[in-house]
Amino acid sequence: MAPRMLIAAIGGATGSGKTTLAKHLGRIIPSLLVFQDDFAPPEDKVPIDPRYGWQDWDDRPGAIEWERQREVFHSIRESGQVPPEHSSHDHLNEQVPVEIDVETERKWSERFAALREQLGPDLPKIVVTEGFLILVDPETSRQFDLQFFLRGDYATLKQRRIDRQGYHTAEGGFWKDPPGYWEKCVWPAYLSAHAPLFVDGDVETGAIDPQQGIELFETQEMTMDDMVNRVCERIYAEVQNKSTAAAEPEANGH
């Protein structure tokens, strides 16, 4: 029998705070972290944009090895573990720290510790995943119990991308955006990939299509503490719901 699982996915543009939020959650909640960047193709397989002659790491079709991602999440759902052949290079990339209040971390750490003690082996295995395209593949999204989208404004996201300098690749290389890459590649690819999730395709200011089951976070209006609190609330409630649902058949003698 497949283990009880709860998978929470955090999407949004580059620089929106996804990874920072996921790592805060990983420190608070006994959980497994999965980073979508680890599903990027090898450097020599990244498509070349014929218009500009540079590698395109951001356009949806070639930015992720989609079948590998689907297989890993299916395996996680079925076994509760990451396949042994899957590896992460997240540790190579430095992040600008965005701290949260110690009281926020303490409060939720204690609540989840108490929940773990209360439920024991009935506590679902919790997985937190994040990525700039993590919500756009319907086959992968079917594995998610909770979905969150972090929306930021153009100017802030662009400046954060500039400040980041570049990205380490799984092979040990380093990718630095060429001039114009944000305007000609990153931003258009982000809008195109996420348009199906929004009413009238309006990614920048529109509402998320209610059928998607995604909760929208406006990062210009929320602190990191706000987002940590909101996601912890949702995960905590979902754990309780799953535990209640699992206990009902036993109570009915089934």
PLM region spans:
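Hydrophobic positions on the alpha1 helix immediately C-terminal to the Walker A/P-loop
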Residues: 21, 25
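P-loop (Walker A) phosphate-binding loop of NTP-binding proteins
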Residues: 13
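A glycine- and Lys/Arg-enriched "phosphate-lid" helix/loop adjacent to the NTP-binding pocket
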Residues: 52-56, 139-197
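Conserved nucleotide-sensing/catalytic segment adjacent to the nucleotide-binding pocket
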Residues: 32, 41-107
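Conserved lysine of the Walker
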Residues: 18
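Hydrophobic anchor at the beta1->P-loop junction of P-loop NTPases
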Residues: 8-10
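Post-Walker A helix-loop "phosphate-sensing" segment adjacent to the P-loop in P-loop NTPases
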Residues: 27-37
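NTP-dependent small-molecule kinase module
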Residues: 2, 163-166, 184-254
